[in-house]
Amino acid sequence: AATMSSELTSLTALELSMAIKLKQASCVEVMQAYLARIHRYNHRYNAIVALADDDDLLSQAKLADGELAQGKYRGWMHGMPHAAKDLTAVKGMPFTSGSLMYKDRIADQDSAMVARIRDAGAIFIGKTNTPEFGLGSQSYNPIYGATGSAYNPELTSGGSSGGAGSGLGTQMLPVADGSDMMGSLRNPGAFNNVIGYRPSTNVMSGRDASQRPLSTSGPMGRNTADTIQFLKTIA
């Protein structure tokens, strides 16, 4: 079982997507594999925060398998686990922005980007860590603490999408979303040996680039193909 788990989590996002679509791996098996890896490593790296209940996530994965059995395929992320950066809203999940001001805030609706990821079939397992309000080239906040680099958890993962970068680099996530004003997608990519791509500010949907001309959301991936595919999902 351990071998199968590591094999599933080491697949690229596109390989994992195809394995699920062709029923070479069930959504439950994929969720079990990722949860096993998270429980084994996340306490050292602190990449994923506000992790949802295992039983609830496995129930959602079972429903996704049931949909596949009935010929209902939601999209390329069908049944894949995903954790959104804790600067964006996921309905029913903590939405702290890394600040004590919002430590008890629960999102009442999905952001536009999260809705697109959900429409592609993803199962939201938690959030990824960020500095308070995303302000910093590290990922520490007073609620969840600091996130460590995938290559040395004693060193910073970068920021502000450091939880996303570390989660990808440790293979606890297939792809990840982040945001960038002054390097917040790019430096976690470098610090964790993954790709953090900052799109032009007019690429992402559901936002008015004129209101925040320097900031934009964007994709992170373990390789170029995964990153491009995920950009197509969230743009």
Predicted regions and their residues:
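Structural signal for hydrophobic packing residues in well-ordered secondary-structure cores
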Residues: 24, 35-45, 61-69, 118-121, ...
